[in-house]
């Protein structure tokens, strides 16, 4: 009996011990499995998109996190500094982690060289950069953006990043950020030394995206205070020659007011993008964000914004049917031409005008493109001269009335104001400035004319300097479109004529589209178009045709000569018949041997 009890008791103990053992094994296996799972996240295998210097959008697309290259699709986690915040960030579905780096005990007797994760005024943290990187690399595939708050932290941090990269552990984009220039409303110098910061990056960790910013302070009492032209130009001088991708962090609440400067900056290199960020109390306007998006390519702008602004903006931005507003001084991309698309996508259009004065009616084109307006001057019996559409012997319609009528139409156009009477230049610019102020000029605008300058001085044409001076003084937010007098083109565009035009336009802030006649271009030095395009990243060439004195063979030769140099930055101001024929030849991938289109109609801006 006692043996039976002992055996029963012993059996129960073994069963209990076995159960506990099995439970422990299962628990350990589960923990180990989770740990191994975290440490063996599906990695990035394509070297082209997996390095620390990879494009963020290409990486996120490759990892299946976004569907296409659009900065609006990228999500961010702010200040993932402490271990608690870091854990929350890692457990979230955000795509990029943003964290701040300084050195332990910064500017105190206890200062060390250890990089820690903290945002000023904090100078201590429960998380070092090494611990932060170990956790992020082991348990996620999120992109990394490190914001450096002291120069002392940069060198040791870059050394650590280099070691991890050389060990093959950093297989994702890394952005290196620091505020290196004084920006709006900041009275004292608190920025990180630009030269030292950029030098450290080049020496220690050049394979990264650089994110150089401005110190800023938003002051509600100064809502119009923003980035200046000088600030933006200084930034370009600092980073223009660097080999890395560069994304400029700019304060969203101040960006639209400075858009002429940032539009210029983005055009300086395909390596550039902007990252719009929002201060916690900044009253960012959704309308301003939409304007910025409408005037840039989707891959050029990232949006690091708070709710509810982000959701409100995203809902409207992704609505393909909403009406867009374009910057008058902006590119035809993406309005009429896809990024890196063919300039032949853009068609030049004309208006039909019936009647005159207030009774005049216009028939707008049934398709999108650049609307060419030849502008002369009407001298009223009293008052100021009025710019009008120039239709010799035809009806009169004022430039203002024409543009107001176009503004109500939903189609997307650009406007090419071609000044055919020199006296109409400043009144036309004044009209454009007035309508722009009222919000009635929602498209890119070109202002151009035949100019007289240097080796191509011809009486009766606008002086080249006067064109540029008038634009700068009256309405600078346009693309300038100068051309050469036809009287000087019997031998084509000679080298000195091109040199003088380039000298005239040197240093212009505005985009320039040089107007070249196709016939004379065929008789010009082979490098004519290339020289003009090389003058500026914003320079384009527009080839147009004249029915006077040029054979159709020369005309087609000129069109193809320009096209052979560049497809993206060459436009074609030609009649619809020529435009269709050129498209057909391009589609068949062969230069044309045409002697002319099947029917040739007059086209405004042509010589006859």
UniProtKB/Swiss-Prot annotation:
Coiled coil: none
Taxonomy of the source species: Eukaryota, Metazoa, Chordata, Craniata, Vertebrata
Compartments where located: Membrane
Residues covered by region (Disordered): 586-608
Gene for this chain: Fam151a
Family: Belongs to the menorin family.
Disulfide bonds listed in the record: none
Name this polypeptide is given: Protein FAM151A
Membrane-topology annotation of the record: Single-pass membrane protein
Biased composition (Polar residues): 586-596
A Pfam family the protein falls into: Menorin
Keywords assigned: Membrane, Transmembrane, Transmembrane helix
GO cellular component annotations of the record: membrane
Transmembrane segments: 14-34
């Amino acid at each position: 009996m006692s043996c039976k009890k002992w055996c029963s008791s012993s059996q129960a103990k073994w069963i209990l011990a076995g159960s506990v053992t099995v439970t422990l094994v299962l628990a350990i296996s589960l923990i180990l499995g989770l740990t191994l799972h975290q440490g063996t996240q599906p990695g990035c295998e394509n070297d082209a998109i997996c390095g620390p210097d990879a494009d963020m959008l290409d990486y996120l697309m490759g990892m299946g996190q976004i569907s296409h290259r659009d900065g609006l699709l990228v999500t961010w986690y702010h200040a993932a500094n402490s271990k608690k915040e870091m854990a929350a960030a890692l457990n979230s579905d955000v795509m990029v982690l943003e964290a701040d780096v300084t050195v332990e005990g910064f500017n105190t007797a206890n200062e060390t060289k250890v990089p820690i994760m903290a945002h000023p005024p904090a100078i201590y943290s429960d998380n070092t950069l090494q611990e932060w990187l170990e956790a992020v690399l082991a348990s996620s595939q999120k992109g990394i953006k490190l914001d450096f708050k002291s120069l002392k932290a940069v060198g040791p941090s870059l050394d650590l990043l280099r070691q991890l990269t050389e060990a093959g552990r950093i297989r994702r984009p890394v952005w290196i950020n620091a505020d290196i220039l004084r920006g709006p409303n900041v009275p004292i110098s608190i920025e990180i030394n630009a030269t030292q910061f950029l030098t450290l990056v080049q020496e220690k960790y050049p394979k990264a995206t650089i994110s150089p910013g401005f110190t800023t302070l938003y002051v509600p009492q100064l809502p119009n205070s923003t980035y200046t032209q000088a600030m933006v130009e200084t930034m370009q001088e600092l980073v223009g020659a660097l080999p890395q991708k560069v994304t400029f962090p700019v304060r969203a609440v101040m960006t639209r007011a400075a858009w002429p400067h940032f539009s210029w900056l983005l055009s300086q290199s395909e390596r550039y993008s902007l990252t719009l960020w929002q201060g916690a109390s900044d009253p960012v306007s959704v309308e301003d964000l939409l304007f910025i998006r409408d005037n840039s390519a989707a891959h050029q702008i990232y949006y690091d914004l708070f709710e509810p602004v982000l959701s409100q903006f995203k809902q409207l931005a992704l609505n393909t049917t909403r009406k867009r507003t374009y910057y008058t001084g902006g590119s035809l991309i993406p309005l009429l031409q896809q990024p890196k698309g063919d300039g032949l996508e853009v068609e030049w259009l004309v208006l039909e005008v019936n009647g005159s004065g207030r009774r005049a009616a216009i028939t707008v084109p049934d398709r999108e493109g650049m609307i060419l307006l030849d502008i002369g001057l009407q001298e009223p019996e009293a008052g100021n001269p009025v710019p009008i559409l120039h239709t010799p012997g035809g009806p009169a319609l004022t430039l203002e009335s024409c543009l107001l009528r176009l503004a109500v139409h939903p189609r997307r156009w650009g406007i090419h104001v071609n000044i055919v009477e020199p006296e109409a230049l400043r009144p036309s610019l004044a009209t454009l400035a007035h309508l722009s102020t009222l919000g009635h000029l929602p498209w890119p605008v070109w202002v151009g004319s035949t100019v007289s300058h240097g080796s191509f001085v011809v009486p009766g044409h606008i002086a080249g300097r006067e064109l540029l001076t008038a634009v700068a003084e009256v309405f600078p937010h346009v693309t300038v479109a100068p051309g050469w007098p036809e009287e000087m083109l019997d031998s084509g565009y000679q080298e000195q004529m091109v040199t003088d035009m380039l000298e005239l336009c040197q240093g212009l802030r505005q985009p320039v589209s040089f107007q070249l006649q196709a016939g004379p271009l065929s008789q010009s030095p082979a490098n004519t178009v290339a020289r003009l395009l090389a003058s500026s990243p914003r320079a384009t060439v527009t080839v147009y045709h004249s029915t006077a004195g040029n054979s159709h063979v020369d005309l087609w030769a000129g069109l193809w000569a320009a096209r052979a140099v560049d497809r993206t930055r060459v436009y074609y101001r030609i009649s619809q018949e020529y435009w269709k024929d050129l498209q057909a030849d391009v589609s068949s991938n062969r230069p044309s041997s045409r002697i002319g289109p099947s029917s040739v109609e007059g086209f405004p801006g042509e010589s006859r």
